[in-house]
């Protein structure tokens, strides 16, 4: 065990984590030159297209130290950098004794850099700072080193200068990992304790779990059980990633590897992420600390746009939730959209990734309702009800107050963009908490309603700061607020899929946007279509799509005018009858257009 090192690479998005992983793999001979490509550990096509890491990936490398010529087993976990996937970082660090914090020498310290450093410190990990991209013409080593000293508090003499692209300084990082990162603390002779870090579904093998063996040894063919659920499994296969999936006969204490296991109850497909596995014979007395259960920030209804059955859709979501434990879902029914699921996400990017994965991996096209947040509702008997759906809010009677989620937002930006960012925060009903100048950067903290930052806040922040401002946020508390539910009525019929919860200040503006969108999308009928946005019984916005009208008098070329009047009168009676029995059918294309955030 003294020759094993477990570590993660953490950083803000696009600071070079995956490129550094590539260099480690190349130097340690994990792949030959013919097999090497950029972003080796980003196995999803979606990750390569977007240029970001979405899922944490593990690789076991053998490195021969320059100092003592000894071979070391390095278990590396590459992690995402986007704020929506910070839960992935937390899970990856649970299997490690240290971390390499990568900082872009041109961009400098950003919000998620600080957030990931705090996560590592909370777990009492040894952190090595690597200043990356020093080969860029825009790199400012002195400025960024000063930022690291003032914001993070690490001496600039301890910073390793490197370029993951060219390989400069990468060997120095590997040597520092061997020297600074502690040996895994465990006992090979103790009862087995293996922590499940991640799981995913394979069409041929079933559920595959990524595990870290904290104590004991796990062999192929062992009978194991979940310490949280008590479910019993048989180990079919196990091994390591090099990054190729290599089978082995056992995983020893301190190692990180993969595991294929099946239950006698075929309906049970795997133990949950964060669970502890132990042997059925000679089990461990207590489980390892579980991951903190994360609460979704953003909720939306997902409905299949095509002919996908509810069973197929539910099966796809279940398989995705194995791979992404932060995805929450429950059944939901809409009069217009049919059966679907109410899903919880960590942010809008997380929602987009799930939507794209359902489309690519399971061929399911979706209609997604307007994203919202979880509200806390206090009713007259002082009972608290949590609401993530506008329709659920409408069904509650005796409401005393509605409380919206407030998040603590930490901004990091150059000084010259401070004024415009403050204006944006004030516009979004923000309250300033602190303002600190560090080196050439400003650390600004605001309390903001979660509902105000889930839609266009990131885009506007990046636009006004030319991409230099960064944001990291965490849930703070629920706060009483004047929230209302806007409903859409079409000829008096409620369209529940378009209901939305907003602040009363913006209700009229939001209602007008919805009504105008619907007016531009709904085709004219042979009767008037009245579109209304209402709050309770009060109409806040109204518009009419005028009827198509047939020229019933075209055959009357002369004669008595009463003939024309009679035809027009009969048409009027027919239109009135048609309006009473006629129904406006909204096709899926209308919902897809009106619920598209980019439209």
Curated annotation (Swiss-Prot):
Main location: membrane
EC numbers on record: 3.6.5.n1
BP GO terms, sorted: positive regulation of translation
Topology term for the membrane: Peripheral membrane protein
Source species, domain of life: Bacteria
UniProt subcellular location: Cell inner membrane
GO cellular component: plasma membrane
InterPro entries in the cross-refs: EF-4, EFG_III/V, EFG_V-like, G_TR_CS, LepA_C_sf, LepA_CTD, LepA_IV, P-loop_NTPase
Residues in coiled coil: none
Protein name: Elongation factor 4
Species per Swiss-Prot/TrEMBL record: Blochmanniella floridana
């Amino acid at each position: 065990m003294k020759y094993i090192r477990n570590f993660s690479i953490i950083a803000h998005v696009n600071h070079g984590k995956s490129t550094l992983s590539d260099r480690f793999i190349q130097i340690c001979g994990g792949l030959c030159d013919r097999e090497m490509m950029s972003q080796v550990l980003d196995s999803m096509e979606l990750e390569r297209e977007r240029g970001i890491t979405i899922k944490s990936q593990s690789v076991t490398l053998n490195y021969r130290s320059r100092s003592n010529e000894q071979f070391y087993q390095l278990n590396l976990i590459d992690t995402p950098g986007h704020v929506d996937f910070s839960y992935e970082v937390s899970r990856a660090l649970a299997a490690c004794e240290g971390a390499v914090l990568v900082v872009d020498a041109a961009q400098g310290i950003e919000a998620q850099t600080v957030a990931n450093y705090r996560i590592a410190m909370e777990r009492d990990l040894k952190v090595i700072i690597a200043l990356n991209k020093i080969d860029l013409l825009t790199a400012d080593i002195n400025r960024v080193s000063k930022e690291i000293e003032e914001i993070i508090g690490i001496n600039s003499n301890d910073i390793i200068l490197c370029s993951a692209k060219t390989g400069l300084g990468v060997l120095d990082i590997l040597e520092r990992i061997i020297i600074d990162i502690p040996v895994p603390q465990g006992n090979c002779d103790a009862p087995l304790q293996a922590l499940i870090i991640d799981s995913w579904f394979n069409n041929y093998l079933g559920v595959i779990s990524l595990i870290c063996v904290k104590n004991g040894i796990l062999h192929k063919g062992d009978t194991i059980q979940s310490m949280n659920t008590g479910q019993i499994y048989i180990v079919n296969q196990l091994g390591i990633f090099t990054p190729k999936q290599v089978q082995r006969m056992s995983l020893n204490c301190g190692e990180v590897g993969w595991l294929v296991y099946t239950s006698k109850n075929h309906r049970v497909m795997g133990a949950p992420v964060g669970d502890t596995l132990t042997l059925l014979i000679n089990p461990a007395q207590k489980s390892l600390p579980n991951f903190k259960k994360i609460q979704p920030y953003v909720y939306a209804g997902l409905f299949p746009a095509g002919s996908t059955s509810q069973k197929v859709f539910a099966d796809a979501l279940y398989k995705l939730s194995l791979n992404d434990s932060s995805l929450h879902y429950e059944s939901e029914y809409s009069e217009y959209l049919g059966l679907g699921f109410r899903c919880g996400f960590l942010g809008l990017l997380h929602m987009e990734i799930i939507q794209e994965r359902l489309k690519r991996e399971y061929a399911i096209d979706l209609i997604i309702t307007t994203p919202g947040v979880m509200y806390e509702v206090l009713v007259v008997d002082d009972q608290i009800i949590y609401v993530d759906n506008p329709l659920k809010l409408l069904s509650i009677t005796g409401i005393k107050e509605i409380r919206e989620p407030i998040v603590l937002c930490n901004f990091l930006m150059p000084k010259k963009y401070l004024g415009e960012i403050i204006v944006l925060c004030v516009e979004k009903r923000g309250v300033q908490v602190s303002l600190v100048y560090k080196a050439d950067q400003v650390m600004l903290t605001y309390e903001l309603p979660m509902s105000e930052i889930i839609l266009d806040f990131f885009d506007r922040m990046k636009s006004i700061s030319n991409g230099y401002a960064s944001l990291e946020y965490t849930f703070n508390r629920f706060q009483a607020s004047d929230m209302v539910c806007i409903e859409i009525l079409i000829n008096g019929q409620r369209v529940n899929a378009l209901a939305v919860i907003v602040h009363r200040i913006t209700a009229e503006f939001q209602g007008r946007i919805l009504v105008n969108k619907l007016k531009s999308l709904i085709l004219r009928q042979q009767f008037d279509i009245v579109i209304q946005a209402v709050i309770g019984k009060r109409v806040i916005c109204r518009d009419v799509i005028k009827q198509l009208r047939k020229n019933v008098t075209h055959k009357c070329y002369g004669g008595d005018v009463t003939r024309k009047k009679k035809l027009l009168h009969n048409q009027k009676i027919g239109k009135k009858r048609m309006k009473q029995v006629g129904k406006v059918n909204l096709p899926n294309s209308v919902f897809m257009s009106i619920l598209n955030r980019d439209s």
